[in-house]
Amino acid sequence: MAKKTMGIHHITAIVGHPQENTDFYAGVLGLRLVKQTVNFDDPGTYHLYFGNEGGKPGTIITFFPWAGARQGVIGDGQVGVTSYVVPKGAMAFWEKRLEKFNVPYTKIERFGEQYVEFDDPHGLHLEIVEREEGEANTWTFGEVTPDVAIKGFGGATLLSEQPDKTADLLENIMGLERVGKEGDFVRYRSAGDIGNVIDLKLTPIGRGQMGAGTVHHIAWRANDDEDQLDWQRYIASHGYGVTPVRDRNYFNAIYFREHGEILFEIATDPPGFAHDETQETMGEKLMLPVQYEPHRTQIEQGLLPFEVRELD
């Protein structure tokens, strides 16, 4: 039986200094830092999670900040553009806000929608689009109030070394619906109302190189542990090499690299980011995986200090 994902769970990228990263995603874009922890495989590196007030799936962008990291190259085998969705009528606010913080942007139209495209301080390609769908983000930070706040992901643009094979995966395995073709892009839509629109570029542009300003992986939603195990079996049955389940504290994760060389993850919606903090205090303290807690002092000494601060 075919399966269907509700859409994007989170997107994880590599960036530079954590203060620059936090100033942009919290200070400029108004997202909430819902979790500060460390990389499970490299406890000397932060893992920072930004999203809506509740840190819900479909709103979470996560970062490995490496100060002084080599600049990456955006290209095939990666998410090329991360799309954010805002309420109808909010675009004028965002254009003024980007201007206020001297962030250059361009306006484009794709599939009948108006987008504002810009880069973060470390070179990640971002865009904003207005849509009715998706619940409002009730978080207020600085001048970013719920009537204009980013709701979460509008979706993403995928760059593939083998677009035909990636297209087959999206439609026939991940369960997305093909809803249109325009120029060099095919559009897919998932069943969810956030993180639900995927544009696939049909022409390869050259292999990307991992580094600052590039996306490391895109994660798709599984309802729960049982659903994730179904996904694991289902994907493996189609010839993909899938990892064992990995406990990431706030979700369980499995990974596989699709034929276009993009690293895919399937992550469970539960338990979520209030798993080890209260909803009210999420993101305020460094939370460590249990195996690293005995080494907290040493780990904290090796991490660059940063703070969430209003820039308005």
Swiss-Prot record:
PROSITE patterns: VOC (PS51819)
Residues annotated as signal peptide: none
Protein's UniProt keywords contain Iron: yes
Induction: Repressed by MhqR. Strongly induced by stress due to exposure to 2-methylhydroquinone (2-MHQ) and less strongly induced after diamide or catechol stress. Not induced by oxidative stress due to hydrogen peroxide or methylglyoxal.
Cofactor: Fe(2+)
Residues annotated to bind Fe cation: 10, 217, 265
Keyword annotations from UniProtKB, A to Z: Aromatic hydrocarbons catabolism, Cytoplasm, Detoxification, Dioxygenase, Iron, Metal-binding, Oxidoreductase, Repeat
GO process terms (BP): catabolic process; response to toxic substance
GO cellular component terms, A-Z: cytoplasm
Cofactor note: Binds 1 Fe(2+) ion.
Pfam families: Glyoxalase
UniProt GO MF annotations: dioxygenase activity; metal ion binding
Entry EC no(s): 1.13.11.-
Domain VOC: 7-131, 152-269
Similarity-based family: Belongs to the extradiol ring-cleavage dioxygenase family.
Role: Putative ring-cleavage dioxygenase that may contribute to the degradation of aromatic compounds.
Protein name according to UniProt: Putative ring-cleaving dioxygenase MhqO
Species in which this protein is naturally found: Bacillus subtilis (strain 168)
Gene (name only): mhqO
